[in-house]
Amino acid sequence: MQIFVKTLTGKTITLEVESSDTIDNVKAKIQDKEGIPPDQQRLIFAGKQLEDGRTLADYNIQKESTLHLVLRLRGGMQIFVKTLTGKTITLEVESSDTIDNVKAKIQDKEGIPPDQQRLIFAGKQLEDGRTLADYNIQKESTLHLVLRLRGGMQIFVKTLTGKTITLEVESSDTIDNVKAKIQDKEGIPPDQQRLIFAGKQLEDGRTLADYNIQKESTLHLVLRLRGGF
């Protein structure tokens, strides 16, 4: 069948393809016609960036569909994600991609829902709203993918301003760990945080399980006064 590829300059390229062709194949055909290396090509259809290993049929691209070709920003790069089984996944990313974006790409490739993914880099768990640049993750960096234990859960932390923060935690996390997660999200040093649950102030060395804090529990965050004791 024929499909069309429209570039940002407005030029339209016509390609002969099969439904079973992969996005890699299509990029190779574009290289043949236009001389643009595949690693500089990003193909968009129906608002979605197309992943190399998938086929046209996977994206329901039919005859006379129009794809959009965007040249990859210089910030484009490959990173690797290693699973506990030892498998390594290669992802095409931008420095400005959020951890959410990366988890979505992993879902596209591996079928693992984002809420079951924990990504680790340099020993640190990566928070969804942050970007690769925030963590200084550069080209060919390797992230580690850990599947979230069944003990993994969300809890909420409500501040005196009324803002509610959502945290991903394990029952075995200590109050110290929780304060560190709050610092990552909100920038509040742990020594200025007091956490309250069921009217009780939580002690740093104890775990969430110790206080019977379960999924979707709400903690209250009170800022410690300077000089307070």
Swiss-Prot record:
GO terms for biological process: ubiquitin-dependent protein catabolic process. PROSITE patterns: UBIQUITIN_1 (PS00299), UBIQUITIN_2 (PS50053). There is a cross-link at residue 76 (Glycyl lysine isopeptide (Gly-Lys) (interchain with K-? in acceptor proteins)). Residues 1-76, 77-152, 153-228 form the Ubiquitin-like domain. One of its GO terms (molecular function) is mRNA binding. Residues 229 form a propeptide. Transmembrane segments: none annotated. One of its GO terms (cellular component) is cytosol. Its main location: cytoplasm. SMART domains: UBQ. It comes from the Eukaryota. It is found in: Cytoplasm; Nucleus. Keywords: Cytoplasm, Isopeptide bond, Nucleus, Repeat, Ubl conjugation pathway. Gene3D superfamilies: Phosphatidylinositol 3-kinase Catalytic Subunit, Chain A, domain 1 (3.10.20.90). The keyword Cytoplasm applies. Ubiquitin exists either covalently attached to another protein, or free (unanchored). When covalently bound, it is conjugated to target proteins via an isopeptide bond either as a monomer (monoubiquitin), a polymer linked via different Lys residues of the ubiquitin (polyubiquitin chains) or a linear polymer linked via the initiator Met of the ubiquitin (linear polyubiquitin chains). Ubiquitin is encoded by 16 different genes. Ubiquitin is generally synthesized as a polyubiquitin precursor with tandem head to tail repeats. Often, there is one to three additional amino acids after the last repeat, removed in the mature protein. Alternatively, ubiquitin extension protein is synthesized as a single copy of ubiquitin fused to a ribosomal protein (either eL40 or eS31) or to a ubiquitin-related protein (either RUB1 or RUB2). Following translation, extension protein is cleaved from ubiquitin. Belongs to the ubiquitin family. This is Polyubiquitin 11.
